[in-house]
Structures are given as structure tokens and as C-alpha cells.
From Swiss-Prot:
Cited function: S-adenosyl-L-methionine-dependent protein-arginine N-methyltransferase that methylates the delta-nitrogen atom of arginine residues to form N5-methylarginine (type IV) in target proteins. Monomethylates ribosomal protein L12.
InterPro entries assigned to the protein according to its UniProt record, in alphabetical order: Ankyrin_rpt-contain_sf, Arginine_N-MeTrfase_2, RMT2/GAMT_Mtase, RMT2_dom, SAM-dependent_MTases_sf
Domain of life, source organism: Eukaryota
PROSITE patterns documented for this protein: ANK_REP_REGION, SAM_RMT2
Any GO BP: methylation
EC number: 2.1.1.-
Organism: Schizosaccharomyces pombe (strain 972 / ATCC 24843) (Fission yeast)
UniProt keywords, alphabetically: Cytoplasm, Methyltransferase, Nucleus, S-adenosyl-L-methionine, Transferase
Protein localization: Cytoplasm; Nucleus
Family: Belongs to the class I-like SAM-binding methyltransferase superfamily. RMT2 methyltransferase family.
Protein name: Protein arginine N-methyltransferase 2
Gene Ontology, cellular component aspect: cytoplasm; cytosol; nucleus
Residues binding S-adenosyl-L-methionine: Y140, M174, F194, G195, L196, G197, I198, I199, E215, P216, H217, W242, E243, D261
Length: 357
């Protein structure tokens, strides 16, 4: 599941006032920064050589004894156009630097700013599904997928651009997720996105009374047929997108457990699915919903922003979210053949979503 966060800073030949603002940021000099902004400096300016903006420099030069001062300056810059998620030449956000330097209160200030920013951004974008996202989904469904084996004991599913759709190192996550949404045998379960079939295999071990799978990609469906999934007892496969299947499913079934792991979809798509969860979960049982929480997982700051954002969004649907943390790791050789790593954090936060009553 894709979850890009905007991380652009203004990059051009900065004015002298803006360059002076960057220097003042190193000194945590709020009054000087305010005066420079009055003179035309922009808080989103970056140092061309390092790629750092004012918030990067604050996080780099603040110390424990000046952290309160750094937070004050950071809040002012953020409220006056500062970029919380700019990435420097070292591939770090201001939050990454603060966290690395153990300035945890400053880090939380930046993360909270990210949450507010993403809430506002999602409200603006929610008015219409962009053509770009529709094109991304369509491109994925038309691309050729390949099942690969990077190492003797690992497997991957890659798209035609070598993007990893699913990898076997996720097995530990999927096993625990299956235990959460189907703690006992005989449950009614729904999974969106088959991939390598990891969680569906674990769910089958629970002998569900109903097991609905939504999978739109023709290559994955071919793989499922080859391995007999269409013929399994109590398994129903919808060979389409969840958006196309959801009304029919909702008219026929309710579930004790739901899992979502759709590839080539954005956070906004996931948020739209939250609305469907309300009508699909059985309110009369201890029903639970979960999803693969890879939101922003190529960067710790982004991951923590989404960790806070999801529960806030779920409240509006009458749902509540808690997290169960678990260490995860993957070997470098397991990523062989994949274009980029979509996972670069050491701890997984497994979302457990229930009705808020």
C-alpha cells in the first residue's frame, strides 16, 4: 500500500535574507528569524549544499539544555510556512535528526505538525480522487507480476517496475494479524489483497466458516487457481477491486475479522475503506479489523505521523484503534531484485481496530 508524504522544499538561489534565516536557525534566534521574515526571508528556504531547511538546522544545533527554546522556534517556523517533511542530502527529515540526537520532545513537536498538515491535506484532497491515483491503480492491474525467490528461504511478488508487492519477511506480521482477527476457529473473515497468500494461509488454519478474498490482479488470480484456492471449502474469491466488490459483499455477509493489504493504493483509499468496515464488521461479536501498516514505513518520522493520524481518522467512523508493537527485520539479500525498500523501520505497529462503544 503506497502512502507518499509530500516532502518538497523550495530549492532555488535563496535571497540573502533567507540564507541569513538559515544561520539564525542554527543559533535558535527567534527574534532575528522573525525580523528576517519581515524583510522577505522565506521559512521554507534550503541550503543548496546540504539540502537542509531551517528545521533541519534547529534539530542539528539544539542541545538538551536548549530543547525548549528549539521547540519554540520550531513551532513559530511551522506556523509560518516551514516544511516539516523536507528531506536533506543525507535523506533525513528534521524529525529524523531530532530523533537521532535524542531530542524526543522536539521530535514529537515535528511529528504532531506532520499530523496536522496531513489532516488538512487529506481534507483538501478528499473532494475528488485524482486522475494520478486512478492511473496508478490501472497501471498496476495491467502490469505483469512475477513471483521470485531472492534467497533459498524467501519469496517476493514484484510488479513490472520491480516494485515489491509483497515479501515473505512479512510472515511474522501476517501470522500475528491472523491471530488478532481470527482468534478462534469458525470465524467469518474477509481479506483484501491476496499477494503471496501469507495471511490467507494462516486464516485457513483457523478453519473459518466463511473466507472471502478480494483480489483484482490477473496474475495473482492465475497463481491462486494453480494452487487450488478457488476450490477450497468456504472460500469465496471476488476477482475484482474492493471498490467494485464491496456493495455485493455487504449485501450478503458480515464478518468477525477483516484485513486490508491492497497494493498501489494510497492512504486516502485506505481511509475510504474505513467507511466500508463499519458496514462489514459484525457489531454483535468481538469483531476486529486490521491492515498492513506500511504507511510511510521507509522513514521513521513519516511512520510515526501515520501512526497518530490513523486513530484520529477512524474516530469519525465510530471506530477506535490501538497498536501492538513487534520488532521486525529483513535481510538485505531478501530485497534482491526489488527497486526500493518500502520498509526501513525496526518496529512494526500492528493496528487493532474495533467499534468505539
Amino acid at each position: 500500500m503506497d502512502a507518499p508524504l509530500v516532502n518538497e522544499s523550495v530549492e532555488f538561489q535563496e535571497s540573502q535574507e533567507s540564507l541569513s534565516l538559515l544561520e539564525a536557525s542554527k543559533q535558535l534566534d527567534l527574534k532575528k528569524i522573525q525580523n528576517l521574515v519581515d524583510q522577505g526571508a522565506v521559512t521554507s528556504a534550503i541550503d543548496i549544499e546540504s539540502g537542509k531547511n531551517a528545521l533541519h538546522f534547529i534539530a542539528s544545533y539544539a542541545e538538551k539544555e536548549t530543547e525548549v527554546q528549539a521547540i519554540e522556534v520550531t513551532k513559530w517556523i511551522l506556523s509560518n510556512g516551514g516544511v516539516w517533511n523536507g528531506i536533506d542530502r543525507a535523506n533525513e527529515t528534521p524529525g529524523c535528526i531530532a530523533r537521532r540526537r535524542n531530542l524526543l520532545r522536539l521530535y514529537e513537536t515535528i511529528v504532531d505538525a506532520g499530523v496536522r498538515s496531513e489532516l488538512l491535506l487529506s481534507l483538501l484532497e478528499r473532494k475528488e480522487l485524482t486522475n494520478e491515483q486512478l492511473d496508478t491503480n490501472e497501471k498496476y492491474l495491467q502490469s505483469a507480476l512475477s513471483y521470485t525467490q531472492p534467497t533459498e528461504d524467501s519469496s517476493s511478488l514484484l510488479d513490472s517496475d520491480a516494485n515489491a508487492v509483497m515479501m515473505s519477511w512479512e510472515r511474522k506480521i501476517m501470522h500475528r494479524s491472523a491471530e488478532i482477527i481470527a482468534p478462534t476457529k469458525g470465524r467469518r473473515v474477509l481479506n483484501v489483497g491476496f499477494g503471496l497468500g501469507i495471511i490467507d494461509t494462516f486464516l485457513q488454519e483457523k478453519e473459518p466458516s466463511l473466507h472471502v478474498i478480494i483480489e483484482p490482479h490477473p496474475d495473482v488470480l492465475k497463481h491462486m487457481r494453480k494452487n487450488g484456492w478457488m476450490d477450497r471449502e468456504n472460500v469465496i474469491v471476488y476477482e475484482t477491486t474492493w471498490e467494485n466488490a464491496i456493495n455485493d459483499i455487504a449485501s450478503k455477509y458480515v464478518f468477525d475479522g477483516i484485513y486490508y493489504d491492497a497494493f498501489a493504493e494510497s492512504y486516502e483509499d485506505l481511509r475510504n475503506f474505513f467507511d466500508s468496515v463499519v458496514g462489514l464488521l459484525d457489531p454483535e461479536t468481538d469483531s476486529k479489523f486490521s491492515f498492513f501498516n506500511g504507511l510511510g514505513a521507509d522513514n521513521q518520522t513519516f511512520y510515526d505521523v501515520y501512526k497518530k493520524l490513523v486513530p484520529i481518522d477512524l474516530v469519525s467512523f465510530g471506530l477506535q484503534c490501538t497498536y501492538e508493537s513487534m520488532p521486525v527485520s529483513s535481510k538485505d539479500e531478501e530485497w534482491k531484485g526489488a527497486k526500493r525498500r518500502y520498509w526501513d523501520v525496526s518496529k512494526y505497529f500492528l493496528p487493532i481496530v474495533t467499534f468505539d462503544f
